[in-house]
Amino acid sequence: LNYMLADWANRGVNNWTVTQVSQTVATGITEIPAGTITITVADSSSFSVAETITGGTSAATASVLSKPTSTTMNLTVPNGTFTASETITGGTSGATTTVTTAPSLVDTQNTIDIVSAIIRRDGNDISLERIGRSEYLQIPDKDASGRPTQFFLDRQITPVIKLWQAPENSTDTIIYDRLVRMDDADAAQNDMGVPFRFFPALAAGLAYYTSIKRAPERMQILKALYEEELMRAMAMDRDRPSMFINLGYRY
């Protein structure tokens, strides 16, 4: 069943798996996680946004993106693994505190793709252009400062959003819609996180994948049924923006 859900994710956007993330950018920080990475500490008030923190025991490092509360900090993807109860030190502020809960990468690792992104400043939203790996590589000055206008999604195991230009302040907010991984099928008593309109495709797909081992002689007809049901469900799940046609006249 999980193999089938992975197949659905690879086929494109499933609207019920799209979530929106808002993250305040930090001055000069060009690489942010494609999700939220939060560390819980005894006290975050003395730390500075955009500074690097270092774990006293683990030697792990990360940059501070924002401080949502007095005991939490949102981080970039850590280099290394922070551990609970260790002391962390701010590279600029010199502040120290104790880690209460080590950061988890699960939320970011569940990101499959970015559907769209904007940068918000003073209530005004500007669309961010998505570029590919080669286009990002060819940018001559990746640290040029300004309001970000482009991003590249580096789809590693822990995906990273690479911004250009480098944020010139720590007040702009990047808001993006992301496609996330569907919940794995686990205990039978738990409900599947799939809309009811996909139930026929789910049943047909399960029959097809089961037939590969149990009834290979039925595999082709079950595959055709599965594809038909899935395409019908995906067609109904797509966005339907209004379409306007303007007629022109030539004399």
Give names to the regions the model predicted.
Residues 1-35, 98-251:
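Glycine-enriched, solvent-exposed interface loops adjoining structured elements
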